[in-house]
């Protein structure tokens, strides 16, 4: 899910992401460590979906393979090793006839050298909550909001919205619908359960339409006598 687990609970004690799972029809199943829930019925075979995607993209002028630029800092063996594993994952999952990961480098600043000139094909980046509400996460991907950091600086979808091409219409319609759902949820301020249910609908819509794809949860562990939530950089 896009929102981190454990961020917030409704008045019945239900953890928020379980509401998203219910909206997506995944509440009765759990990840088995091998096959994604939505691909489990066919054993993880994406060949039909891949064929459909290539046909639809070819129809609007896309040529294959698509080259995805992924930037890492130059001179870092760890970053290169990680990117090499990711490149192999692309090969194994998509096939080099569909998507090829191109490993590229920046010297010192990903912001100045990659993000600002919009050279990235995608970015793997984390987000931490400032306070315990789903809008912390979902609000980062909306349109028509200068505070939607990811829309403006990572996916650049906010800039696409200013003058979308014909082939981008369906995508922009989906983002507009998602934005409306988030704004409607955020307007509910006197009923916590209704607010979380509405946000869950928005998040499910985002995930089902793959407006963004969650990658992993980064969980840090430490052994300490201090209360982590009493520190200056506590999550919220």
List where the protein language model places each region.
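Detector for C-terminal structural segments
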Residues: 1-26, 74, 78-88, 114-236
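Ligand/substrate-recognition segments at binding pockets and active sites
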Residues: 23, 30-129, 220
């Amino acid at each position: 899910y896009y929102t981190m687990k454990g961020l917030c609970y409704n008045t019945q004690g239900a953890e928020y992401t379980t509401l998203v799972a219910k909206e997506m029809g995944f509440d009765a199943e759990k990840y088995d460590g091998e096959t994604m829930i939505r691909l489990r019925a066919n054993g993880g075979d994406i060949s039909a979906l891949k064929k459909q995607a290539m046909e639809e993209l070819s129809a609007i002028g896309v040529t294959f393979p698509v080259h995805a630029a992924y930037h890492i800092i130059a001179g870092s063996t760890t970053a290169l090793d990680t990117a090499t594993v990711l490149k192999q994952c692309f090969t194994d999952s998509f096939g080099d006839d569909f998507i090829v990961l191109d490993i590229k480098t920046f010297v010192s600043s990903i912001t100045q050298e990659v993000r600002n000139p919009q050279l990235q094909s995608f970015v793997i980046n984390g987000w931490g909550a400032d306070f315990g509400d789903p809008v912390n996460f979902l609000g980062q991907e909306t349109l028509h909001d200068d505070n939607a950091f990811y829309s403006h600086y990572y996916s650049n979808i906010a800039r696409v919205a200013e003058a979308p091409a014909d082939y981008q219409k369906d995508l922009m319609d989906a983002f507009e619908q998602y934005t409306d759902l988030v704004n409607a949820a955020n307007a509910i301020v006197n009923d916590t359960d209704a607010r979380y249910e509405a946000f869950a609908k928005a998040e499910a819509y985002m995930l089902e339409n793959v407006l963004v794809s969650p990658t992993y949860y980064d969980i840090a562990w430490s052994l300490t006598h201090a209360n982590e939530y009493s520190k200056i950089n506590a999550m919220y």
